[in-house]
Amino acid sequence: MSNIADRDPHAWRVPRFFAVAGIAILLTACANSQRMRTMQELQTTADARTVSPAFERYTKQTLLDGLWKRPQLSARDRSIVTLSVLIARNQTVEMPFHFGLALDNGVKPAEISEMIAHLAFYSGWANATAAAEIAGHVFDQRGIGDGELPAADVELLPLNEVTEKQRAEAVQENFGQVAPGVVQYTTDVLFRDLWLRPGLAPRDRSLVTVSALVANGQVAQIPYHLNRAMDNGLTRAEASEVLTQLAFYAGWPNVFSAMPAFKDVLMKRPS
């Protein structure tokens, strides 16, 4: 940072401002760290029982010994769905645990890296920034280096020109005069770049997107992306069980809001 000119009568305020700001940031970081430690302590069985015995029982019996062991969806897919919810809703307290669990369940570091990049577009840059910081700590603890992560620029997967042409024309017709910038970025960055990155399989990329949409109650976008997910290999049984997983991590109201859209898609697709 360049120095303020000595003749500026207010120059002394600048370093003082940054000193105060630095202290404030440090105190905030300490407070956040303490808050995260406190919340993580609440996740222990004893603390959960002390605060809410019912919550502790549901966590152990219904969630961990029940939901996560259901065979209709692999543990890996459950981790992808759950992480997508946490990132999309910026629920950072549980991220360290679930980043670690995802790695244990077979989600590769490269796939987590791509999930964060993908969700920057579908849930916002700030949410992805927060997730990247926490994932970085988990990667460091596990000795995961840059060599295991996708490069910024990669050879993209082949594009289905026919399908993309149909999508682009529909979006241009509907919204080209409303927000041409959004339409242009949607084509150039999302569907001709992001969705073609090979570090996350198209099925999994769709799974991430659908999970984020349900988690944030963005029902209008579900039909397109659920159809795309199933075109990319997600089965009807898996789509159904994704909703079951999401009920616990995104909440029952969001899932019930999404179910009519899921029902409509499933009924219109060939069995």
Positions of the model-derived regions?
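Hydrophobic/aromatic-rich structural module bridging two neighboring secondary-structure elements via a short loop
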Residues: 98-130
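Bacterial N-terminal signal peptides
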Residues: 18-28
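Preference for long, well-ordered alpha-helical segments
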Residues: 127-128, 218, 238-257
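Acidic, glycine/proline-rich low-complexity segments that act as flexible tails and inter-domain linkers
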Residues: 30-76, 89, 94-97, 104, ...
